[in-house]
């Protein structure tokens, strides 16, 4: 059972941190600490969720015009 929790934790970490820290550092030439990297990833997820919400809002708004 403990092994399942470890696998689940690793899965969520893999999904949440979908951009590898070394890739971010090589693309941007930044030298990030772990805390800065986590803050950056939280910001990326906030932007992704906002854009998803905005896209869905626009779709429902456009569909509402045709009713």
From Swiss-Prot:
- UniProt keywords, alphabetically: Host membrane, Membrane, Transmembrane, Transmembrane helix
Which compartment or compartments is the protein found in? Host membrane
InterPro entries xrefs: Phage_1-C74_Orf10 (IPR021217)
Annotated Gene Ontology cellular component terms: host cell membrane; membrane
**Which cystines does this chain contain?**
none
Q: What is its main location?
A: host cell
Identify its membrane topology class: Multi-pass membrane protein
Presence of keyword ATP-binding: no
Q: Where do the TM regions start and end?
A: 10-30, 40-60
**Coiled coil (residue ranges):** none
Record's family? Belongs to the plectrovirus ORF10 family.
Please report the name of this protein according to its UniProt entry.
Uncharacterized protein ORF10
């Amino acid at each position: 059972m403990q092994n399942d929790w470890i696998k689940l934790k690793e899965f969520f970490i893999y999904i949440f941190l979908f951009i590898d820290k070394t890739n971010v550092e090589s693309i941007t030439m930044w030298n990030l600490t772990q805390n800065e990297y986590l803050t950056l990833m939280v910001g990326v997820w906030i932007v992704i969720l906002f854009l998803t919400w905005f896209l869905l809002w626009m779709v429902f708004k456009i569909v509402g015009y045709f009713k």
